[in-house]
Structure formats: structure tokens, C-alpha cells
């Protein structure tokens, strides 16, 4: 194994899974992360997941979890965001939803039933950006262009590109904004009112950290230190399908569904397998969140104490 990707002995990565139940009612159990579980782990990488048949495999460590039902509309997830209150928001094919990561309960946010492509925002804020297509109740032009919300997704306003651009990937740190519509990158320094051409690169996911703009490309992870105008390949990174980060570090999920974490993008630690998740985001405290159509995973990285 490439030593730059090998899990280091001083790091523990744990996951709590909140998975969909059978939808028939019944008792609901709240997922609780127990510190003793982490202490008991003899391996350096632990995955806290569910013991039911839908659980991810435990090749990288020990697994336990709790399963609770999720609402059906959370299929076709296009993005996740942690708002100012710490609530996890999910952009879907049929609107914006909140997810209670302790119980798995979801609720619609606002009145829109639009297709929320590229949902994102500066982590820990109520300032969101999105693109996509109008829903059944909307008469907005298709595609929606760049939209923004200042109230956590309750209401939305059009910023630019209405009727012309569908951003499938968006990333912002609150100052810079980078977007991809499948025809190269576009960059903005005024919240998406005006745009400038960026690198001519195909990306599947974008995130912005203090170290630069990170992108998942067909050739692997790459980083830009000039606001998205050019990118440099990061050979130490695993073959990621999703990436997200803040000043507290980076999270990634590879094509096989394994989770990776990195403090700086130079060295990566491999965690357990969460499977075919559709979206990934990072909270302001460094916690990661990944979601599939029927489960949400809370990802934590902590220093081992013994």
C-alpha cells in the first residue's frame, strides 16, 4: 500500500449510520455515539455502522449502528450542507429537506419543489447556493441558473444565468464561488452575479478550503491555488468520487464507497466502507456527513488517546 494513503496509528475515524427502516412504524431508537466504543477499538480506523443486513462492511474496523426510517423524497441527493444551527440540509430532485442525524427524521424546508442541483454553501451558515431545474409547481425558466438563499433555504432568489446554465457542482467559502456545468469551470467573486472562465476541466465534485479549490476529476483529485483558473494533480490522494472540506480538513469517498480523511490533502487515512453514498459535506467543526437514498452517516476523526 502507498504509505501516504495508509491509515496512521494515531488517528481514529468513526462513523454513525442512521439508516432507513421498514417504514411500518414500530419503535424508533436514537443513534448514540459512545466514547467507550472508540476506546475499545484496537485498530486505528473504526467505522460505526449498523448490524442489520444493509450495513456497510467492516473491513477497516469495528461496526455498530442504529437504523431509523428516512422519508422517500430523499432519493436523488444532489448536495448536503450544514446550516448555522447545525442542521443538515439535503438538496434533492424534489426540493430541499432537513435531516435529523440523530433520528433520521426529514422535513421539507421552504415551499420549493425544484430540483436542487449543486447545493452548497459556506459551512455553518444560512447562506446557500444552488442550481437545477424548476419543479412541477414552478414557472421559472429551465435551467434555473445560479440561485441563492440567505435564510437557510426558506426562500430563494435568482443571481444569474437563469435559463442558460445548470451548475451540477458548486462550492463557496462565502467569498469565492466556483461552479461547473460540465463544460469547464466558472468562477465568481461577487456571489455569482458575474462570472469568469476558470480551468477547462471536467469535475464531479468541488470544495473550497483555505488551501485552495479542490476538485474530483476523471484523472483524480486536483487542487487550485489561484481560485479555480488552473489545477495541479494531487498524486497522494486516493481515487475519490466525492470530496468536501473546511479549515478542519478534508473528507472523501472513493468509487468503492470507502471513506478517506486528510488534514491537508498531502496524506490520507482510509476509513471504513459506507457504500454508494450520493452526497458529502463537512461541518464547521470538522465533522463529515455522507448520505445515500436511505441512510445518513456521521463521520468523525479524532486523535487516539492510548
Spans of model-derived segments:
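Repeated scaffold domains used in trafficking and secretory/extracellular systems
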Residues: 76-79, 114-122, 164-172, 201-210, ...
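Beta-strand-rich domains and repeat architectures in extracellular enzymes and scaffolds
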Residues: 69-97, 115-118
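Surface loop/turn motifs at the tips and blade-to-blade linkers of beta-strand repeat domains
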Residues: 69-73, 109-112, 160-163, 196-201, ...
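Blade-level signature of beta-propeller repeat domains, shared across WD40, Kelch, NHL, RCC1
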Residues: 281-306
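C-terminal motif of bacterial Sec signal peptides marking the signal peptidase cleavage site
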Residues: 46-49
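Asp-box/BNR beta-propeller loop motif
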Residues: 95-109, 143-159, 186-197, 222-233, ...
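Short, solvent-exposed loop/turn segments at conserved positions within beta-propeller repeat blades
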Residues: 137-143, 180, 216
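Bacterial signal peptide processing site
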Residues: 51-53
Amino acid at each position: 500500500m502507498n504509505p501516504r494513503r495508509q491509515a496512521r496509528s494515531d488517528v481514529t475515524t468513526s462513523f454513525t449510520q442512521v439508516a432507513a427502516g421498514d417504514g411500518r412504524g414500530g419503535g424508533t431508537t436514537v443513534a448514540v455515539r459512545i466514547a467507550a466504543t472508540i476506546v475499545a477499538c484496537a485498530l486505528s480506523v473504526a467505522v460505526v455502522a449498523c448490524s442489520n443486513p444493509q450495513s456497510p462492511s467492516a473491513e477497516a474496523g469495528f461496526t455498530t449502528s442504529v437504523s431509523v426510517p428516512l422519508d422517500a423524497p430523499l432519493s436523488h441527493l444532489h448536495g448536503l450542507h450544514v446550516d448555522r444551527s447545525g442542521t443538515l440540509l439535503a438538496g434533492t430532485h424534489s426540493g430541499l429537506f432537513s435531516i435529523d442525524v440523530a433520528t433520521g427524521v426529514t422535513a421539507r424546508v421552504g415551499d420549493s419543489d425544484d430540483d436542487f442541483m449543486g447545493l452548497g454553501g459556506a459551512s455553518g451558515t444560512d447562506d446557500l447556493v444552488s442550481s437545477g431545474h424548476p419543479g412541477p409547481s414552478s414557472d421559472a425558466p429551465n435551467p434555473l441558473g445560479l440561485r441563492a438563499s440567505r435564510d437557510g433555504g426558506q426562500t430563494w432568489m435568482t443571481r444569474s444565468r437563469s435559463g442558460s446554465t445548470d451548475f451540477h457542482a458548486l462550492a463557496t467559502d462565502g467569498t469565492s464561488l466556483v461552479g461547473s456545468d460540465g463544460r469547464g469551470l466558472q468562477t465568481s467573486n461577487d456571489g455569482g452575479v458575474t462570472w469568469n472562465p476558470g480551468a477547462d476541466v471536467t469535475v464531479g465534485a468541488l470544495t473550497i478550503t483555505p488551501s485552495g479549490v479542490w476538485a474530483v476529476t476523471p484523472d483524480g483529485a486536483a487542487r487550485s491555488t489561484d481560485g479555480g483558473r488552473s489545477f495541479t494533480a494531487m498524486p497522494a490522494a486516493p481515487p475519490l468520487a466525492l470530496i468536501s472540506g473546511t479549515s478542519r480538513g478534508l473528507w472523501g469517498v472513493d468509487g468503492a464507497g470507502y471513506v478517506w480523511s486528510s488534514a491537508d490533502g498531502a496524506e490520507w487515512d482510509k476509513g471504513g466502507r459506507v457504500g454508494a453514498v450520493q452526497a458529502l459535506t463537512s461541518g464547521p467543526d470538522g465533522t463529515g456527513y455522507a448520505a445515500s437514498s436511505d441512510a445518513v452517516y456521521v463521520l468523525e476523526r479524532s486523535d487516539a488517546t492510548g
